[in-house]
């Protein structure tokens, strides 16, 4: 068969499954199954790139954060690398579609991960946290050990909530040499204040599930 067509159709299918999760909370019984299908199809499609997209895991506090790495080219020559971080409702697979192609076309390695609160991690009890620089540091720890990453040209790009997480991480980690943000949520308080749950009474909050309490 035609590998490019196969790759494109697998990635298209992955994104269709991903779109079905847009308005679904992680405590929905279908969330885990569909999320796993997103990952399965994406990895099958990613394997058909040249070089193939690599799935990797970042050790973090006794568990791991899932991510993807697309090399700029074959071989282990160190080159500039872009790490992308998403926001409140993103999957690492989303972020690949967002800018990986553009990064690759400009000679960058591209990496992205799910931080606590993102992707399927809420199903493991890993919800958002205020010290997001801690998991980002763990990601950088993994990246700088790769022979194909130029440690003097590691940059990070964040969208939405990631537009807050990225500069925060750079404040704590000088290994991040440059940052860029898009539609950054730099103050979450006004955003959360517009959400119905923020207006719940103590009696209503007593009926929250453990998932909602964590979020």
Q: Where do the PLM segments sit?
A:
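N-terminal targeting or regulatory segments adjacent to alpha/beta-hydrolase or S9 domains
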Residues: 1-50
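N-terminal cap/lid segment of alpha/beta-hydrolase-fold proteins
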Residues: 32-76
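Short beta-strand element of the alpha/beta-hydrolase
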Residues: 77-87
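The serine-hydrolase catalytic nucleophile loop
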Residues: 88-101
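Conserved alpha/beta-hydrolase
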Residues: 103-120
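Alpha/beta-hydrolase active-site loop
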Residues: 126-152, 156, 168
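Gly/Ala-rich beta-loop-alpha elbow adjacent to hydrolase catalytic centers
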Residues: 158-162, 166
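Hydrolase active-site cap/lid region
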Residues: 171-215
């Amino acid at each position: 068969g035609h590998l490019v067509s196969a790759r494109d159709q697998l990635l298209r299918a992955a994104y269709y499954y991903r779109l079905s999760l847009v308005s679904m909370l992680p405590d929905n019984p279908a969330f885990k199954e569909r999320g796993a299908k997103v990952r399965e199809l994406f990895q099958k499609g990613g394997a058909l790139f040249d070089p193939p997209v690599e799935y990797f895991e970042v050790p973090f506090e006794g568990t791991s954060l899932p991510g993807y790495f697309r090399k700029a080219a074959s071989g282990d020559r160190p080159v500039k690398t872009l790490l992308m971080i998403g926001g409140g409702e993103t999957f690492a697979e989303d972020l690949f579609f967002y800018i990986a192609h553009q990064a690759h076309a400009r000679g960058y390695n591209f990496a992205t991960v799910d931080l606590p609160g993102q992707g399927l991690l809420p199903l493991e009890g890993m919800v958002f946290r205020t010290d997001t620089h801690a998991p980002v540091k763990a990601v950088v720890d993994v990246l700088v050990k790769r022979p194909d990453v130029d440690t003097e040209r590691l940059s990070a790009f964040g969208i939405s909530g990631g537009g807050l997480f990225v500069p925060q991480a750079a404040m704590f980690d000088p290994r991040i040499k440059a940052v860029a943000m898009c539609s950054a949520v730099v103050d979450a308080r006004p955003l959360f204040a517009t959400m119905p749950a923020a207006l719940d009474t103590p009696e209503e909050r007593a009926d929250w599930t453990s998932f909602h309490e964590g979020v």
